[in-house]
Amino acid sequence: MSAKDYDFDIESVLPEEKAPQVSEAKKDYISQESTVLSGQVDFVEPEHKGFFQNLIDGFKPAREADGNGGPALKRGLSTRHMQLMSIGGAIGSGLYVGSGSALADGGPASVIINYILIGIMMFFVIYALGEMAVAYPVAGSFNTYATRFIDPAWGFAVSWNYFFNYFVTFPFELTTCAITFTFWTDVNCAVWISIFLVVVIGINLFGVRVFGEVEFVLALIKVVATVGFIILAIIINCGGVPTDHRGYIGGSIIKQKPFRHGFKGFCSVYTTAAFSFSGTEIVGLAAAEVGDPRKTLPGAVKQVFWRVAIFYIVSLILIGLLISPDDPKLMGNGSASVSPFVLAIQEANIKGLPSVFNAVIIISVISVTNSSTYTAGRTLHGMANLKQAPAFFKYTDRLGRPLIAMIVVLSFGFFAYINEANNNGNDISDTVFDWLLAISGLSNFFTWGSICLSHIMFRLAFKKQGHSLKELGFVSPMGIWGSVIGLGFNILCLMAEFYVSLFPIGGSPNANDFFQGYLAACITLVFFIGYKIYDRSHIPSLDKLDITTGLKTYEYEETKDSSDTGRFRFFKKIINTVC
């Protein structure tokens, strides 16, 4: 009797090789996929060799289970991390301090109107980014999208501009943090720079999980502080503070001078408001380090609505009711004392609270500093994956850290010590930082505009090549027209910045002011043309645009909402969009 006389294949009865069981704690070391595009590889469980040996081994190259040579980023961020990062990501010195100069330049009405307009713009931008980030949770995120969906040369130019923005922001924010301490003490700024430099280096060297936990705590503090200020500001405005001799304020202050410096002041506030939202897009950059982008990113994206509605608009309306735009303290020397939030508390003669809120400002600056190193390092790593930066920046260790890119970024933090050059009675550091920041001053507009244009190209190509939106894990409810509007807003931002750079408030046209405001556009154009000549890249047609590599598609049954039917469907859609 032979095997073929039986009703089964003899190989089917051979014992199968069982996969080893992995505990939940150890699953953190294992990624869900491995592709060259996403930069994800399987993390091999570390051996128990002792703390110091594992610490040393952690710096060794990541082990690539599939042997494809792709660099690795560890998926160590959870839903909890992403949602707090999205809420607190843009709550920082732009809101707490930058709003003061905006109030002085354009008046309270200009501040409120422009922050609402920029909030609407970011609503469209972040939803477009969220859709692409769920579909392509890749290293480099929106910089990768610009390279693939727009033009490789444009992706190269925008990526380097974006990198320089956060690369320079790191030492600048360290200096800002040190200056903020002058609110309490005259201790040399170099002392505080050293302390916070060590702290930031430590946070980043411990990996993305520690980064996520630190940002979670810092964001939570900022959220609580901002909500607390809103409540306090309402009490102050209603005359509920016994130490405030002004009594009931109401709208008496905002009526005096709602607008300042005319149209020029309005345009100036428009660009200042846009800079205040810098960092919102980091949620998309972190997609490559999120365990389940489809479940995590949509919730983080939807938090943009609440961030704009509550933390920016409400708090700035109250600031406009409490602080006069003519207050000379608003245009101070860059310390925390010029914060309109601190001024509002000081004007009410509340003892102790100004120091508390000054501490919150320091925390927010630390958060921005921490995010800057994370963003610059991941951007440089992503560019190396796309061959837009030297290949050695792809190096990733066994803990999922882009080690060489991080070392380069963290090393530039020592540049903050140039602040000591001011001790001799000159302003060398101010001049140097002004021009360093000018190199990438428009990177936000280029990045946000590129996100919208990438989404437009992605949607057009997706439809052209016969795909359905039902295949996507998350779909922007604003669709392609939301991205068109978002792109239009960013073009207006560039036009407004050109206008105020050419005709500065309180001065006549001059080369210094113009190039400090618009140098980034010139440099980006040079990078774009230079890469075009070098690579001879071209814009692909819609039917040839590569939308399949790395695309994560889903069955419609998994993505549709079974409750999205019935008489309340329209209201459910609105609630699902913002909640």
UniProtKB/Swiss-Prot annotation:
Signal peptide: none
Keyword terms: Amino-acid transport, Cell membrane, Golgi apparatus, Membrane, Transmembrane, Transmembrane helix, Transport
Keyword Cell membrane tagged: yes
Keyword GTP-binding: no
Extracellular side: 105-108, 185-186, 237-265, 325-347, 423-431, 493-513
One of the GO biological process terms: amino acid transmembrane transport
Function summary: Probable amino acid transporter that may play a role in function in microtubule organization since it causes microtubule defects when overexpressed.
Annotated protein name in UniProt: Amino acid transporter 1
Gene name of this polypeptide: aat1
